[in-house]
Amino acid sequence: MSQGQSKKLDVTVEQLRSIYHQFHDILEEKTDLHLPKKEYDDDAVRREVQIQLQEFLLSAMTMASKSLEVVNADTVGKTVKQLIMESQEKYMEPFDLDLNEQVRKMYQEWEDETVKVAQLRQTGPAKINEVYNNSKDEYLAQLDGRIGVLQARMMQQQSADHDDSTDDADDHINWEHIKQDYVASLNELYQTQQDLPKVRYNVEKVKRLMDFLEED
């Protein structure tokens, strides 16, 4: 042991790195046991665990360094932590806190979206059916209203045709009503024809969405 520092244990850089590697290998074995490697390399969970273990091991070795004295001459100016970090690079890329935080957030967002999709698959079909039925009922009610207006106009016209007491002035007024009713009927028919493509499109869109949600 070095004079003046008898309480510290003399070790070489090689011994320090050997200790670190042995601990690292033990932790890796535990990781493989509980988190087996997957077929693809982009395993965010496993990488996060490895990062946490690296930080834990680095912290433990740093605390232990208070009882160690690295005796190699080429380590002048370097701390035990720096030597450990150099050894750490053998196992993984330099630790990037910002990149790791971005990966963690993206993984969390992916998990959140996965939960939302799962919930949508359960509740989506019923909700879509409800919206579709409400829209269908509303459109049919509008059609019934238009048909009712046209029927009322036709009944008024038939009643006017059978009224023998109608004079020439009334005949002129009735013809004006007939013309107005005819124009209104054409407008109603045109509007209905304009609405049909939109209705067909909405029905097809709902059908595609339901097919997607019902997929396994």
Curated annotation (Swiss-Prot):
The keyword Nucleus applies. The modification N-acetylserine is found at residue 2. It is found in: Nucleus; Chromosome, Centromere, Kinetochore. Keywords: Acetylation, Cell cycle, Cell division, Centromere, Chromosome, Kinetochore, Mitosis, Nucleus. GO terms for cellular component: kinetochore; MIS12/MIND type complex; nucleus; outer kinetochore; spindle pole. It comes from the Eukaryota. Its main location: nucleus. GO terms for biological process: attachment of spindle microtubules to kinetochore; cell division; chromosome segregation; mitotic sister chromatid segregation. Present with 3710 molecules/cell in log phase SD medium. Acts as an essential component of the kinetochore MIND complex, which is required for the spindle checkpoint and kinetochore integrity. MIND plays a role in establishing a bipolar spindle-kinetochore interaction by joining kinetochore subunits contacting DNA to those contacting microtubules. NSL1 facilitates the attachment of two of the DASH complex components, DAD2 and SPC19, to the kinetochore in a microtubule-dependent manner. This is Kinetochore-associated protein NSL1. It comes from Saccharomyces cerevisiae (strain ATCC 204508 / S288c) (Baker's yeast). The gene is NSL1.
